[in-house]
Amino acid sequence: MCEPASEFELAQPDDWHHHLRDGAALATTVPAAARQFQRAIIMPNLVPPVTTTEMAQDYKKRILEALHASGAPAGSFDPMMTIYLTDTTPPEEIKRAAESGDVKAFKLYPAGATTNSASGVTDLAKVTATLQAMALHGMPLCVHGEVTDADTDVFDRERVFFKTKASALLSDPTPNPTPNPNHNPNHNPNPNPNQAPALLESAPGLRVIFEHITTKEGAQFVLEAGPNVAGTVTPQHMLVNRNAMLVGGIRPHMYCLPILKTEEDRKALLEAVRVCDRIFIGTDSAPHAIGNKENSCGCAGCYSAHAALELYAEAFEKAGMLQRLEAFCSTNGPAFYGVAPNTTRVTLKREEWTVPDSLPFGDTVVVPFRAGTKLQWRLQDRLAA
């Protein structure tokens, strides 16, 4: 029998779904992200939400100031900004974002789906022209894939979304087209907003990323979709099921949205990751102050940036597919977003260590995912190309 590998080298990963928060929290979140990743797609659900290119650029400036203050070298981390899509986002904002070079995607939150999502989209028909402009300018759409109606069980919100809503977002499954100067983004060839084909026909080439998929239905949807559709998966949804959050007591630091699912769902995610190059890393690292998690109405989100690659390595090794880790973390995402993979390399070394019970977070602390437990892999310094 072969001895297990003592170390594993891979191209520097990126994170295609990351929450840094704002203000004093950046002193913790930015250097942690920069240690793990070269680039990260930064979520826009601040208060107020990042709804314009100018707001995204101002937020990026604050992130880079925090990076500099941490002592990290300039250029060691590239925050790729996103804009929060609302019912009133004009098509002109897509053009401004695309031309800025700072904004890499727009984020669609169904109103009320997760933290700070009250300003999210209430009806896809209201953003048809904006989605058309995104396809025209090659701007991807990141989607939080859950329904939010009160009659749907929280554990079924993603299942219902993929059974009833997801197809309305999909474009013709062809490669991203060259922008057509004669394309009219306000023209809708199917005027009935209640029919899914309206969006399929009106936004050809739109690239869609279904973020943090958690169910067998979500995994199957991405597997069966065309080349313009991708998915991301978090470390917690690969490692544990809902028992970890609920059995033997409620563990608020395991609570995230989409919520942890069944063991059957977890295994379906692992199998999809094993076979599909359009599924890639997206930690959804989402820190909250300890007091906002440990109370009678705690916030959703797991903070995983402190050990993201170590957590993914554990999940991949347990699933017997460590050889797929580099594709998932380092090459699948850049290929879908149309950017070059990183040339620097990192090493994960087999080394047992204990995750701290808490980490600084502004004037309080954040409890990281797997706090107080032992991990078997540890990230080493970056290597030259």
Stretches with model-predicted labels:
Residues 12-23, 141-147, 233, 285:
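Histidine-centered catalytic micro-motifs
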Residues 202, 274-341:
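His/Asp/Glu-enriched, well-ordered alpha-helical/loop segment
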Residues 15-16, 29-54, 68-86, 102-116, ...:
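Divalent metal-dependent hydrolysis catalytic cores, especially in the metallo-beta-lactamase
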Residues 309-384:
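Mid-to-C-terminal alpha-helical segments outside catalytic/metal-binding sites
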Residues 93-107, 116-175, 182-281:
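Histidine/acidic residue-rich metal-binding segments in metalloenzymes
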Residues 1-7, 178-180, 184-187, 382-385:
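Eukaryotic N-terminal low-complexity, Ser/Thr- and Lys/Arg-rich leader segments
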Residues 23-30, 88-98:
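Short, acidic/polar
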